[in-house]
Amino acid sequence: ENRGDGSLDQTADLTEKHVSHGRSSENRRYFRSDKEKHLGGKCMKKKVLAALMCAAMTVGMLAGCGGNSTAGNSSSDAGEAASGTESADSGAGRREMDVEGDDVTTLEVWTFIENHQDFYTNMAEKWNEENPDKKVKLVLSNMAYDDMHNKLSLALESGEGAPDVVDIELGKFPAFMTGDIGLKPLNDAVEPYLDNVVESRLQLYSKDGNYYGFPTHVGTTVAFYNTEALEAAGIDYTTIKTWDDFKEAGAKYKEATGKPFAACETTAQWTLNLMLAQKGGDYLNDDGSLAVNNDTMVECLQTMKDMQDAGAMDVIAGGQPDNEEAYPLYNSGDVAAAIMPFWQTSRYLSYMTDLSGKVAIAAPPVFGDNDAVKTIGGGGTGTAVVASSPNADLAAEVFAYIKLSDTANVEVWNVLGFDPVNTAVWTDKSVTENPDNQYVQYFNTKPFDALLDVQDGIGLLTCYTDEKMPSINNIFCTETLNNIFESGMDVKEALDEAQSALQNEFGE
């Protein structure tokens, strides 16, 4: 998982199939790792591993902790971890703030990304400076991703041992929205910032009109283009406005270079989820029942399949752009474009250093003027307050400041490279165009120009908040997308298989 709230890393590392069905060996060299050239009997092993993981995730959901999300619902925060660059930390770590004074409230905070501890501590220090009569001392515990979410589930169920404040990854959040919700509604704390915060990001962590999580960033899905590679192939990225334009440019690039233009994702759904939202679709019906084989889903996946057939998309190593196997392909210029959440900026700086000054950020392609939305947010980590905390009201006020205030969101951009959820920052050119900022220096366009282009059209898939999503993500990223883009299965047939499997799992 890429929890760089970023993000949930949408990677399903169980399946290593990166061979594009029907591709020549010459083309495969761009997206096959050496260890994958002899698949042989590995296919069966992969299917067994995928099945075991699916079963394990189901058990996890029954235990009340939710499954690991994979696709575009994941977190990107500290790195968002990877995504932000957030790769979830594997071990526990504990630290305490050193706060002077007699009237100081201690808040226990759980995280699964160490970078979040740094950010929260720095912002709590600013809070204490501005609010000397309401000082807080954060005691932060960082745990492995699954360990922390499982521990939280048990603590809320037993009524003992829960923290005051906790980070909950987007893919896990729905599991904490069922039954007696143990988290505090945050509406009052959010209210002072509501006018400037991207509403769709608050909705990710909401139920029945109540907000239960403070978002870390927007994760606006944008397009990243290697302008040097495209110009050499005679392509002007600024002419790419629609998916038809994207397809035409991709086919031209493939013909000119023999290299992939963009990723046909098999271990994530960044592009699919964007298209689905633009078409006004979803994975579920309005009543919450499964509908992964609906007509809109078929249309979107067929659009991607047609792009693959035209040479505009290819299956790449790692199955998606945000993967350690894929970074070298982008860094070397072997793949020219990526449709990804904005937090991918941090990946470029960390893993694609050779592209400094060669990458443009643009609004993503659309189908047309009648699209339901222009883009969506991808990934996320919601910071929640435990309802039973004796300091719940103060904790909510403090963390609303830490996550939503102008001051905090300037640092979200400067330090983490994420697109701030508080859009007041988006128009502050002293921040967004600061020549000393490492992200401003890296990209050859102004990063926030793309965000401003889509500011009035940032939507979401409502299914993100449903407890079925971890299972849906899992089957798409281990079976369905591979069946379509690697095995050449008919789109409707592959989706019907997924629908049947999920209906069996949930008894529908």
Feature-to-residue mapping (PLM):
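A structural signal for short loop-to-beta-strand junctions that line the ligand-binding cleft
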Residues: 155, 163-166, 193-229, 260-261, ...
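Helix-loop-helix "hinge/cap" segment bordering the ligand-binding cleft or interdomain interface
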Residues: 129, 133-137, 187, 191, ...
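C-terminal lobe and pocket-closing loops
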Residues: 344-355, 368-378, 384-475
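Hinge/lid segment of periplasmic solute-binding proteins
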Residues: 83-99, 169-221, 244-247, 255, ...
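Extracytoplasmic/periplasmic substrate-binding proteins
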Residues: 175, 274, 302-397
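Conserved C-terminal helix/tail region of periplasmic/extracytoplasmic solute-binding proteins
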Residues: 89, 93, 231, 309, ...
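Short, solvent-exposed loop/beta-turn-alpha elements that line the ligand-binding surface or hinge
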Residues: 99-100, 184-199, 239, 261, ...
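Extracytoplasmic "Venus flytrap"/periplasmic binding protein-like
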Residues: 126, 130-197, 204, 231-234, ...
